[in-house]
Design a protein with these regions (language model features):
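Conserved, mostly hydrophobic/aromatic
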Residues: 25, 203
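A short, acidic, amphipathic alpha-helical segment used as a generic capping/interface helix at domain edges
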Residues: 161-171, 186-196
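Extreme N-terminal starter segment of soluble prokaryotic enzymes
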Residues: 6-12
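C-terminal helical cap(s) of enzyme catalytic domains, especially alpha/beta-barrels
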Residues: 47-57, 208-231
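Catalytic beta/alpha-barrel core
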Residues: 12-14, 34-42, 61-164, 178-184, ...
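Residues lining hydrophobic/aromatic ligand-binding pockets adjacent to catalytic sites
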Residues: 196, 200, 215
Length: 231
């Protein structure tokens, strides 16, 4: 089935690496941008480039995600501190920066993510225990990859998984104001029952070869076409 966003849902762009792309996407009312700080990623962005981008076009109404995977704790803390300091010095935010999020895809325990005392999202898969969700004081979003949910559906385990997930959410006290996020590729064809199980607040799409003319050379017309087709 063709994916079209429901009312209230947002698009998030993963692997953002230049100002021009962000500016173009902002014109399409996209306000969620993830920066890939995983050194082995094709979309890896160095800290100084990230800081230059935010210094030039930081918007207090946007949401910015710093994506890490199996990174050293002190590296995460330094980059987070530098980003928050830049935002505060820009005069566009108070000391409490609420639109900078950590993003993790390494399958570690939630208490590790909680140790940064910063709003975060994590990519949920078979490495996590659903009962650990109750530890999520700073947890703001859970990301499901479409490939993982499709695997559960194909193996006949999706219904059981959803039941366990919703059961754990109901046990959380106090209830968290938490978003559900679905990450998928531009040409993924989601199975119909997926949206009976979940109401996603955010759908994330990557900057990859499907929207590039060559490596890190965005085909802006094609990207616009894809994004407009989801809105």
């Amino acid at each position: 089935m063709e994916l079209v966003l429901t009312m209230g849902s947002r698009i998030k762009i993963d692997g953002t690496y230049n100002q021009n792309t962000i500016t173009m996407l902002e014109e399409l009312k996209i306000n969620d941008f993830s920066f890939d700080l995983r050194p082995k990623s094709f979309n890896f962005i160095q800290e100084h480039v990230l800081l230059d981008i935010l210094k030039a076009i930081y918007r207090p109404w946007n949401r910015y995600y710093l994506h890490f995977e199996n990174e050293k704790e002190y590296v995460i803390e330094k980059i987070l501190h530098d980003v928050q300091e830049l935002v505060v010095k820009s005069g566009n935010s108070t000391d409490l920066v609420e639109n900078i999020f950590l993003e993790f895809s390494d399958g570690l325990a939630l208490h590790y993510y909680e140790s940064f005392k910063t709003p975060y999202l994590f990519h949920l898969d078979e490495r996590h225990r659903l009962e650990d969700l109750k530890a999520g004081k700073y947890l703001r979003s859970i990301n499901f990859s479409y490939s993982y949910l499709h695997h559960l559906q194909q193996s006949g385990k999706l219904g059981e998984f959803v039941g366990g997930f919703l059961k754990q959410l109901k046990r959380m006290e106090p209830p968290l104001k938490m978003e559900l996020m679905l990450s998928m590729d531009w040409n993924d064809d989601p199975f119909f029952s997926l949206f009976h199980y979940f109401q996603f607040n955010v759908i994330s799409f990557p900057l990859n070869q499907k929207v590039e003319l060559s490596y890190r050379n965005i085909d802006y017309e094609l990207l616009k076409k894809y994004v407009k087709g989801k809105l």
